[in-house]
Structures are given as C-alpha cells and as structure tokens.
Amino acid sequence: MTTENGAVELGSQSLSTEQTPKAAAGDGPSASEKEPSAPATEKDLSPPNAKKDPGAPDPKNNPDPPSLKKDPAKAPGPEKKGDPVPASASSQGPSGEGDGGGGPAEGSEGPPAALPLPTATAEASIQKLDPTQAPSGNQGSGEAKAGKKAAECREAGRRGSPAFLHSPSCPAIISCSEKTLAVKPLSETTDLVFTGVSVTPDPQDPGPVKAGGTNALAEKKKEEAEKASGQAGQAKVQGDTPQRIGFQAVPSERVEVGQALCLTAREEDCFQILDDCPPPPAPFPHRIVELRTGNVNSEFSMNSKEALGGGKFGAVCTCTERATGLKLAAKVIKKQTPKDKEMVLLEIEVMNQLNHRNLIQLYAAIETSHEIILFMEYIEGGELFERIVDEDYHLTEVDTMVFVRQICDGILFMHKMRVLHLDLKPENILCVNTTGHLVKIIDFGLARRYNPNEKLKVNFGTPEFLSPEVVNYDQISDKTDMWSLGVITYMLLSGLSPFLGDDDTETLNNVLSANWYFDEETFEAVSDEAKDFVSNLLTKDQSARMSAEQCLAHPWLNNLAEKAKRCNRRLKSQILLKKYLMKRRWKKNFIAVSAANRFKKISSSGALMALGV
C-alpha cells in the first residue's frame, strides 16, 4: 500500500474470511458459509464434554486416536486473527488425495526439519500431538488400532512430503483448538498449519497481540475451517487458494516493493521516478591538498583535446593519473603575476574545507614554471542548463525542486564552513551524469572565507547573478549567495533571466532597483509555493532573504514524493532556456571576435598602451 507520502508500507496481510477465494471445486459456497458456527467462548478452550456437546460422537463407537490431542505445553501461542486456516489432509496426501482409512494428513507429524532460511516467505507450523492425552470417554480396543493407523500415516508423510512441510513454525502460528477433532472423520483433518508471516522465526514473539485478535475469534475460525476441510482436496495452493488451505505464498519483501513501485508508475504513467538521493561522493576520499612542484607529465596523462571549459584563468580538460588510472579534471591556470598564485592558494584553502558530496572535490595541485594545475573530481554530466534543454528531457516543477534542493544542501555546508561562493550561476552547476538529477557545485576561484564580525566587500562576478550589495560595493554576507540562488531558480522555472538587459549597464541597473516580476505566461504552470520561494530570495534587503537552512525548510522543497504525483506538467522554461543558451554562446563569440578585431587595429597603430599592455 502506498501511503500519502508515497511509501510502501509492507506488512503482514491478514486473510479474512470475506477476502478468501472460494473453493475450486464447483465455485459454490464453502462449508463455513453453509454452516455458520457460533462465536467461541472461554468454555470452547476446555476439553470437550460429551454430555455438554450433543454433536460429539460416542467415544465407544468412534474413538479418536490419542495422538490427535495437542500438547498445550508445546503450543507457541493462540491463533493470530486473520491467519490462514489449516489445510485438509486430502490436499497433501502422497497421491494428491486424502487417506480414506482415517490416517492423518501427509507430513502432519514427525520431527521438525531444519529452520528455513530467513528469506522464506511462508512458514509451516507443525502442531505437536501428545500421545499421553486422549479424548474423554472409554476408548477400549479401538484406541490401539487408531494409534497404529496414525503412526503408519505419519511415517508415510515423512517419506513423501516436501521438506518445508516439516520446518518448525514461528511463535506467531495458529494454535489448535482444544475442542475434539471428532466433528469430521480423521481422513479430513490435519495438523499442518501454514502461515503467511514473512518474518524470521523468533521464539520470544508472542504472536497474537500483533494481529489484534482474541483467542475466541481464533478458535471460531479454526472451527469453521475444520467443517470446510473436506472440500480442500481439489483446491490449488497457488492462484485461487481457498480458505480451507492454510498456506499463502506471500511474495518476498523485495518483490512487494517492486510491485508497489510498478503500481505507482502505472497510476502516474506521465511521471518518472526522480533520483532525489544525494549524489555519490568523489571516487577518492577527501584530502588536504598543498601546492607542490613536480613533473605533471610523469604523474598524469593530460588530454587537452577533451576540453571541459575555460575562461580568463585558463582552460579545463580531462586527464588520467598514471599510477591508478583515475580520471580527473585538470584546471590549468596561467601564472602571470604573483596575484595569480595568491588567488590559486586561496582557492586551494577553500576547497580543503569543503567535504560535501554536492561540492566538487580537490585531488592534487602542482606548480610548474608557467602554470598551476588543479586536479579535481571529474563530473561527466555537463552543465545543468545544457542538460535540461535537451529535447528528450521532460522538465517539470518537481525536477526543479530536486535540483534546487541539492544546490541548497551544498550552499548550506559552505556557509557552515564560513565560505562564500560569490559566483553561483548555471555554468557552475554540473550534473553528475547525463540521465539523472544529481548535481554538484564547482569553481571556487572567486570564493572567500567569511567572518561575520569583519566587513567583506567584492566587486566581481557575473552581472546577471550579482546581488545589489555587490553592485553597490557594500558589505556582503552569506545572503549574497542566496540572491544568486533566487536568480537560478527563477530561470529554471521560467527560462528567463530576471535582470538581463540589452547590455551590462542596463542589467546592473535592473539589479540595483530589484526590478523584476513574474511573467504571466511563463509562470502560468508554476505553483504559488515556487513563486513564494523566489520572492523570499530576490529581496534587496539582505536581512529579509532566506538563508540556506530556511530554504530547505520551505514548503516548496518538501513532500516531493506527494507533489510528484500531481505535478507532472511540463514547464515552458525548457524552450526559453534553449534560446537563452544560444544567446549566451553568441554573446561570448561576439565579444571574443570583437576583442580580437580591436586588438588587431590597436596593434597595427602601435597604441597598445590603450589596453594597458
């Protein structure tokens, strides 16, 4: 059963009288339906009295074997309410039919076999018979004859019955009624009880309390089963198991979970189950890295052709450690001035503090005469925005929740370690793989250590994602990163950049004035919770913005399993984000070409001083 929150609750399933299928033979009403029995009382638990029970046969004419009496001392406990009822002897005989001679059912007696494996999903209960007890009344010479017949049948049962029929039961099994079994002929009774309890046997388990039943109700179901056991020989154990058969082939726990997930997937066929688990850690343990000199080519095989990115600092490509074969990402930083090395040392110091699976991990740092190379965890999924604009990807609001929650987890850890990223943007959020929803934050080149008691100001970043305090060159705090998170969330939901202008000046003016709004068309399918989440981040006043911890407690980022069932509408942001990425690429190419042309003109005129060269 799937709860409201989507969990599969597994539990022992009671087999009530109303839920049990009818007998296979004739599909007619069962014997228990034809002859309803009165509710059992405390008197039913005492040995029967021929005078009090007019329906009991005369012991002199139809004596019961003493072996049919159950030893109360060996009984594990009263019957659980709703447990399956005992099977008839006719369904378990060596040839598939009951013994007409009145012997007990096949496998109904004998020493118990080895305990079944813990993974067994059905358990057999062998109800021990005490040969010292006998029914009331004078048995005479018939007692010895019946006892011999019972012994022969028990021996036949041990030879021909399956192994699991002899396995001992857990204490939660059905206990036999103390009432005499002379209501039906001996050939139609059995002492085997199978239960569908899929738990490991525990001798300390009392059993009946868990089922919530009473001894009286349990005895009533036993009495009804004994009356109907004569028709059980034609029943099938699997599929249409009738109520006379006390064996239920309960599937294993893993199968039940799989079936529940399949059912959920069928009910919500338009929703794909999200892998909202935390991403796996780096393929190497967290380490404290120190910048050292060395020969890069002797330790690593650089693959400069497989470029992963680049910028003002240099380029990023893949590489392989020769000693271990570990694939890594190599960030090659040009060392032109002493400040360049100082910035790299600060980046190494920051990354040494960040041991979190939503944050990229540093492996090694090597300095050469002209470069500093940082070897980091390789993340193969690519940029988040590149991933979600794929035509085969179905972006929903729930996907956005999963992405944003992981980003918040990484930011929260950074802030607890007194680190500010200060350059959160879509390019710095990578997917772990090309198919899942797991992301990691990268690029700590602009990150700073943060002390709330000290004033910290910065004047760098990407204009679209800068906060008002950075543009104004005011004191920053951990809330500065939260503004950038609000911009990223806005873009994931709508595909639009809230402050993007025709140029950087217009963009910065929009940021300073906090001039933004929810576009009616693009936010048509977005929930009010998502809008409230963004509104509490894109606030000019730092103190009014949510922290990372408050974001994780926001209603929008919680109860994802429940929201996934009803929030399956595809967002329009996919199409708009694709246009945004195309425009971003065009802008980068335009700037690069313009800079190259300008440099060519200036160099030809000999006025390099205009560029500060």
Curated annotation (Swiss-Prot):
Enzyme class per UniProt: transferase
Domain Protein kinase residues, every copy: 302-557
Compartments (UniProt record): Cytoplasm
Active site (record annotation): D423
Biased composition (Polar residues): 1-20
Biased composition (Basic and acidic residues): 32-55, 67-83, 145-158
Protein's name in the database: Myosin light chain kinase 2, skeletal/cardiac muscle
Organism of provenance: Mus musculus
Underlying gene: Mylk2
